[in-house]
Amino acid sequence: MFKCPERVSVKKKEDILDLPNLIEIQIKSYKQFLQIGKLAEERDNIGLEEVFREIFPIKSYNEATILEYLSYNLGVPKYSPDECIRRGITYSVTLKVRFRLTDETGIKEEEVYMGTIPIMTDKGTFIINGAERVVVSQVHRSPGINFEQEKHSKGNILFSFRIIPYRGSWLEAIFDINDLIYIHIDRKKRRRKILAITFIRALGYSSDADIIEEFFQIEEHSLKSEKDFSFLVGKILADNVLDEASSLVYGKAGEKLSTAMLKRMLDANISTLKIAVEADENHPIIKMLAKDPTDSYEAALKDFYRRLRPGEPATLANARSTIMRLFFDPKRYNLGRVGRYKLNRKLGFPMDEESLAQVTLRKEDVIGALKYLIRLKMGDEKASIDDIDHLANRRVRSVGELIQNQCRSGLARMEKIIRERMNLFDFSSDTLIPGKIISAKGLASVLKDFFGRSQLSQFMDQTNPVAELTHKRRLSALGPGGLNRERAGFEVRDVHASHYGRICPIETPEGPNIGLITSLSSFAKINEFGFIETPYRIVRDGVVTDEIEYMTADVEEECVIAQASANLDEYNMFVDPVCWARYRGEAFEADTSTVTHMDVSPKQLVSIVTGLIPFLEHDDANRALMGSNMQRQAVPLLKTEAPIVGTGLEARAAKDSGAIVVAEEDGVVEYVDGYKVVIAAKHHPTLKRTYDLKKFLRSNSGTCINQRPLCSVGDVVVKGDVIADGPATDKGELALGKNILVAFMPWYGYNFEDAIIISEKLIKQDAYTSIYIEEFELTARDTKLGKEEITRDIPNVSEEVLANLGEDGIIRIGAEVKPGDILVGKITPKSETELAPEERLLRAIFGEKAADVKDASLTVPPGTEGVVMDVKVFSRKDRLSKSDDELVEEAVHLKDLQKGYKNQISVLKIEYREKLGALLLNEKAPASIIHRRTADILVQEGTVFDQETIELLEQESLVDLLMPPCDMYDVLKSLLSDYETSLQRLEVNYKTEVEHIREGDADLDHGVIRQVKVYVASKRKLQVGDKMAGRHGNKGVVSKIVPEADMPYLANGETVQMILNPLGVPSRMNLGQVLETHLGYAAKTAGIHVKTPVFEGFPESRIWDMMIEQGLPADGKSYLYDGKTGERFDNTVVIGYIYMLKLSHLIADKIHARSIGPYSLVTQQPLGGKAQMGGQRFGEMEVWALEAYGVAHMLQEILTVKSDDVTGRTRIYESIVKGENLLKSGTPESFNVLIKEMQGLGLDVRPMVVDA
């Protein structure tokens, strides 16, 4: 069996940890959302289950009718993902939900169809209307609590906090200039401020004494004589002091004690006083108590309501319900587990499961937050403000969560409709069942809208496997609930210390989205709360262990972390007494005894694409960014070639992108051809697994997807082996470009300004040839005027134009086509208005005429040439119009299908019985198995399984069996689950086939009779104007293709394949390309492939040694000879092998010319752009250029007849046809537009005719 070639490396030891599955972020999130494969009663309260439990039960307004949710059930997809792409439909499953309705007539249960829900393919994508889409994860501000500070205009620092819920009103508190704290509810209504103490009272702390007790430590002090005065004067009372007999108040809680007050108290025989420790009259709480206009719970509630809703009558009931609704009703206010976790962590509350389940606000939270705010104000060192750009305060919303939020809004909309229907239902005439009051539209339309229109549901970038992989790992700060591109400042976009190992500092787009769209680092994972974690090795007593700990950004703050490249001895202890480490985002030289953790790998810093750049550490960050982005634009080539100089990530990137086919279990290859590979399982040779290969499919970006087998019959394969290559892969490794022999030198000025000179040899060898596939579609509909028809019989078209069309009017496969050729012939009925008056008259006299159709054929658009590689026809079948022969043929077909279906089911049953036997036969039952509905014991604990018991189990379904968890029963459950899913899938496939035989393609759009898709493949060779690039951001445009004989050559006669400009290196500071050139030359000569991972690559000295070992000049420079003259160039030139990519910006897609075409309606000037068949704008500066040359006639022609002189251009067209050559220009339409504009301003402008 063929294996991936080993790459030579200078790395001392391999990484301790393997990369996680690179698309886990997508798959894991959606799996948790749907919980496919779990029984209804085993489902956790997350995802879709959580939404249903949140919204239901729904009660009618009089509470007589209750609708409860019981469980949901997902069907099986009707078509495979590939078939959905082919048919242009959505890859989805049906969602059926079981409800229980209780009303005055009794209890009724029913399963209600709730529409379809798109499901994820195993590659982490969705197929929506036949196009693969990706839902990008969103980074947003985490719910929870944030403490901030801002500077007042007077120079004071004002502290504030903000409690941000997952859903509901924001609560903000801010100090003002007088050290009073004001509460704001909802940012939008910032002007409505409430004193913090009033708000606390409204929460239920009614008396001043209660409030003081919450904020201060209380001590009792005795008051016996005037000696105690010295201690007590100036202290703050914690409770009211009053004479119980006469109810006379001597001091109020919060008051400052004075000598006079104390004397009065002493005279009244008051012996003890409650004092607030550490309180003084300048303390914010004491100040606010003095300022507070309210003194009781009721007064505070009313004051709160008045400020929140000025103008409305402030009744106690209204006020209480408002505050309850705002913060204490789980349907309106939800912190979410995340918000509660962040809040409890910051304020030091317990972190147990019970505490985290509390999703609404508590009184203690507000008190705790105010205490923390006051600590900040008082300068407590342990209290700190939060950095909103720190990854501890930003979290990721993945696919599952985004769709869960959509489902929530859909069901909330549905809730209102259900309540209305419950109220309007007439019980006297009909019985109420769930199906009558539930409308499935709400949920289905919300999901359709999200997948089709949301900013985060994107058409997948499928240029090559890396583009696909990166798109799934992308993080966006844009989208609903996120940032706005225009308003996002510099700080949000910037690289932050907490990004280390979590978000790649390099890979982000150039332009307006810079820093807002980022990529997940290679080892990063997302935890249950949505925070990004990165792995570290734990260091214990100076020994670096192999234990791995995944840490979020806030936990990492407290750790001292050494670099992965720190020197260790054979006992994994630090060699040096000091090493470079990080603490709280700062790098410093740390004593190794203080180190607590160590990086897992140097590449944990960067994303996968950036990790594919060799010698990244020698490139400037700006160029590395371009290198990362341009690798995603590389076109898969016809002949792939893995890079000589790689980084070791190539194989993993190819595998996780899903481009290659990987063996899922050990076995032996039994059969191979271009379309499939069959492997017999090692442990069970009768079980065969077929791997279907993708052949010449069109990707989203029009490139070609084709898989080629790499194994032969008889090969032994191990799980994880590569058995077939895909697009842009070579023997299981990523192969985006070609290894090219380059010289860095100027050559006759042709490589000025980053231009690239290439040898004609590359064109002859098809080195950079790629295949593009275009899809053209035509539909025949049933129109008001009659049916459209796909036919070869097209009016006014010569026979030679129809030469390649078949009898049915569809082009034959293999035909070469060019612009204007007919692909599918179609005729459409003409409407009466399209006929000339005389024709209408003749038809009125002589009746109908046959030629009342017009040509509406599908033709090849300009700029497309190629070969027709595939044609797909979809059509509906009409039961009534079938002939007897067709009906007989259909019956035979259906009989064969049924026979095949029964066979498949019997094979499946035999396989299942064998598997059950292998697992259970002659084994002892570890526990009893009970029938869920009848409560019968099917298998007693300790029973030895015999054939009879196994057959008994075989007839039961998984839902009905109650099995305690243990190893044997866990395997049994998964076997049962797989078997039931396979049975379901067979049944769905059988029904789909039957439907197809009877009705044709029933899922065509309404009104469509027939649909034809034609695929045209074109071979694109490299040509002048194509964009090329290396992996270091060194991009350029092909400026000249030089005959091989004219290219510079080495002393041994070998010609250089490409010439690059040496001036492109120094100012760009991407020296990685030079090092790659040298190492590539040495490795090519030695016949090896090398890997130079990020920060652990080949040192310069090792490259020199390799060059000398291979007999090459140590400095990598050689003398070259001019191919044109044969003379030697004066100086030596750097030559070597560099990996160059061809990018998807091909000149063939951009070049465009117009002779005639459409004009704009208002200005009558030609439209712009290739898509509109537009013209080239001749603007103000171009006019100046022609004026400078004094070419008046040419100018007049350009500005009038070639542009917007309507009558003039008609005349010139006629004169050209007649062969005359005269220019009579009239008034340009833009002049008329100008006059109309001026008249619109109320100026009476009219052209005057002046006699000559």
Curated annotation (Swiss-Prot):
GO terms for molecular function: DNA binding; DNA-directed RNA polymerase activity; ribonucleoside binding. Keywords: DNA-directed RNA polymerase, Nucleotidyltransferase, Transcription, Transferase. Its EC number is 2.7.7.6. It is an enzyme of class 2 (transferase). GO terms for cellular component: DNA-directed RNA polymerase complex. It catalyses: RNA(n) + a ribonucleoside 5'-triphosphate = RNA(n+1) + diphosphate. The keyword Metal-binding does not apply. GO terms for biological process: DNA-templated transcription. NCBIfam families: PRK00405.1 (NF001616), rpoB (TIGR02013). The RNAP catalytic core consists of 2 alpha, 1 beta, 1 beta' and 1 omega subunit. When a sigma factor is associated with the core the holoenzyme is formed, which can initiate transcription. Belongs to the RNA polymerase beta chain family. DNA-dependent RNA polymerase catalyzes the transcription of DNA into RNA using the four ribonucleoside triphosphates as substrates. This is DNA-directed RNA polymerase subunit beta. It comes from Chlamydia abortus (strain DSM 27085 / S26/3).
